Amino acid sequence: MNLRIYAALLFWIGVVAVSCNRDDISFETPASGLRFSADTVFCDTVYNQVRSESYAFKVYNDADQDVVIPNIKLGRGAGSLYRINVDGKSGTEFTNVPLRGKDSMYVFVEIAPTASGPEAIATDKVHFTTGSGVDNVTLFSVVQDAEFFVETTGNPNILSGTHTWNNDKAKIIFGDLTLASGSTLNIESGTKVYFFKNSGMTVQSGATVNVNGDLNAEVVIRGDRNDPYYDTIPKNWNSMQFENGSLLNMNYARVFGGTRGLDFREASATIQNTIIHTFEEYGIHAVNSTITASNLVMNNCQFANFGIFKGGTYDLTHCTLTNQWRPVAAPALIAGNEWINSQGQTETGALNLNIKNSILHSIAANAVIFAPISGQTFSYLMRNCLITHDSNGAGFDITGNPAVVAPTVNEDPSFMNTLISKMNLRVNTDSPAKNKGNTADAATVPLDLVKISRTANPTLGAYQ
């Protein structure tokens, strides 16, 4: 009896072993075409000689029977800028690739391009040969030529003297880039500045950065990942830090996606026609600094869009500061006399803050939070501003406050679109911000962010 059981067990083990031998499975060439999850794969914009991240599409066998795909190859063969990975193997051409009935497989794609000009298009096709002919999936990517600034042990990555960055090449910063004391960096219109993860820039005392963008030719400062997904998430890079006595002149820039955007330590700045959004901490972090801003748009920062510490002097005219950060709502602007330095010591300074013809909005109860201390100057004026306000926790009252002139309180500004992926902070025609501006203040900034005149019936915020 035991011998019979043993013999039967050996028989079934043999059957299973034979049935699991892949070489004995019957695969046929597909009689009909395969199905694909996409007919075109759009890869991230990539930089000259930098390998992209991997992208994928799926190949489906909708038939009941198992099939073998006779040939899968890149159209440009070994000369292609792309590489594909099929069934765990990387290359440019594959033969006799099996695919079971009612099953699918991934094909992974990456590109390691070369570029001979500022921007080029790289295309290829993945050809799938079947019994019914050849199916194709198109591969598409934009390739940018790039100049690299890489910090290493032997290269501290310091710029000295006067430098000008043009839009002929993207600027890629790996590690920290330092602009030496007394030096000047000019960043011209249309230039794109990309920071790798955990990278940033330090502008030393007495150094100057001039950002000279223009409408439709803005200077872009962001993380190095160009996929649209990364446009909406923070902490892809660190910050641009301006040390004591340094200077920033910024016009028409888009700064987004880092930990802190512009970090000022007793520095000076003039910021015009600029959009700053999506930062892990602050879009602007200012310690006892002097900042003049107009047509400034800010949104989506976890601690606050604009953080002011240890006082300073600030003048904001026709700015749109809304904070749509989720899940924990945060203010648009916070200001105080104190700052805790890196040694844990508390430093204090006098504050002078003027905000005119602006939108100060948040999904939190208070768009503006003040933290004055006794014994220090805390001077402010908010004139003709739309403001989200709750006296609890704001640090100031609006009713009967001579420093708050002609406010529009707790009304929805009616933005066109607050989604970060589609952000448009123009206001609709029925917005309570329409025609609410002080004309004398509007005359100091006569054109809005898109160069529309606002000298008559000025709208609050950066857009007329």
Predicted regions and their residues:
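Bacterial N-terminal signal peptides that target proteins for export
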Residues: M1-L9
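Asparagine-centered strand-capping/turn motif at beta-strand->loop junctions
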Residues: V59-A63
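Short linear motifs in exposed loops
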Residues: F108, T455-N457
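C-terminal motif of bacterial Sec signal peptides marking the signal peptidase cleavage site
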Residues: V16-S19
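Contiguous beta-strand segments of beta-sheet-rich domains
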Residues: I69-L74, A120-D124
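Beta-strand/loop edge motif enriched in small/polar residues
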Residues: N21-F27, L34-T45, V50-S52, A56, ...
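Short, solvent-exposed loop/linker segments at beta-strand-coil boundaries, enriched for Pro/Gly
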Residues: K73-E93
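Short acidic/proline- and small/hydrophobic-mixed sequence motifs that coincide with surface turns
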Residues: S52-E53, D64-I69
